[in-house]
């Protein structure tokens, strides 16, 4: 990853960190506070939301020189755009969310879910862990 940052610096491109989200009240959003959603009908690494679906549920697209890492990956949509994914699940916004922090799309049609973080349960282990201590539910 060090080399990617060096290349970005050489070419005058700002690299985006591997975690493109923030957490507010247990819900993950982009850095502008727009809630992120997953779609039950997506396959791992593949978006199945296009056309009218994509108008109501815009993809959380990847900016220039973005670097995936950890639970975050990048999937390529059928139209060629790149979309953020978490644990292989593509991420979306809901067009019906008017303000940062809105979660109006949660459980829409029983197949759209706001991305929530939940503390992992502690496991009995004598060794130290380097985990961030969060899992995601969708």
Q: Could you tell me what each predicted segment is?
A:
Residues 1-4:
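Positively charged n-region of N-terminal signal peptides that target proteins for export
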Residues 17-138:
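Compact beta-sheet-dominated domain cores in extracellular/mature segments
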Residues 7-8, 121:
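Intrinsically disordered, low-complexity segments enriched in polar/charged small residues
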Residues 8-17:
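Hydrophobic h-region of N-terminal signal peptides that target proteins for export
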């Amino acid at each position: 990853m060090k080399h990617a940052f060096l290349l970005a610096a050489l070419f005058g491109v700002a690299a985006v960190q591997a975690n493109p989200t923030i957490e507010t009240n247990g819900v993950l959003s982009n850095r502008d506070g727009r809630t992120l959603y997953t779609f039950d009908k997506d396959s791992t690494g593949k978006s199945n939301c296009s056309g009218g679906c994509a108008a109501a549920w815009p993809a959380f697209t990847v900016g220039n020189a973005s670097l995936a890492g950890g639970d975050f990956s990048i999937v390529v949509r059928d139209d060629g755009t790149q979309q953020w994914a978490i644990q292989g699940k593509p991420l979306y916004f809901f067009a019906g969310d008017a303000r940062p922090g809105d979660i109006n799309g949660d459980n829409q049609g029983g197949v759209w879910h706001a991305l929530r973080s939940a503390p992992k349960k502690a496991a009995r282990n004598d060794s130290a862990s380097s985990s961030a201590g969060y899992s995601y539910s969708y």
